[in-house]
Amino acid sequence: PRDQLLNWSAREVPQRRHLVAQNSRFLILPSTGRWPNLASRVLKLICQELPGDWEKHFGHPVLLVEPFVDPQRFRGTCYRAAGWQALGKTQGYERRGQDFDMDTKHPKELWVHPLGPGALEKLRAKELPPTLQGKGKPLPPPVPIASAQMNSLFDFVRKRLTDPRHRN
């Protein structure tokens, strides 16, 4: 959903993902007591402080925050109350490591919040402004073979490599 909102191609994602921060842990337990609007106040403070802290730590700005909410456990009410935009469900993949996605078949709800005026326009631009370029992952060269050839290469290697663990 995020890539569709921002009109990112598959090749642009690795170049621009560094401009998006994931808010992966945010929960206010009921035992905290009753504080009106506590969650939306905390989210507002996070969004005010995050850009400066991020740039200080990583050396480049961050333009968008995205949390993934498990709809089987939570409703995302705090994000709705804080004015974040719900983009819909993910495809059910979970990031494991820098470039490895695991299919969990458990879609999450994706919410986004732009950090500052013009953030979405910058992220959607055909060319990133110079201050945002060069910080993402460099693009790998295009693979000069077709996917059918890649599958046959995989089969070729798989048939010829043995797992040394089976010797025990």
Question: In which residue ranges do the predicted regions lie?
Answer:
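Secondary-structure boundary/capping micro-motif
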Residues: 20, 24-28, 50-57, 74-77, ...
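Acyl-donor binding region in acyl/amide transferases
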Residues: 1-117, 128
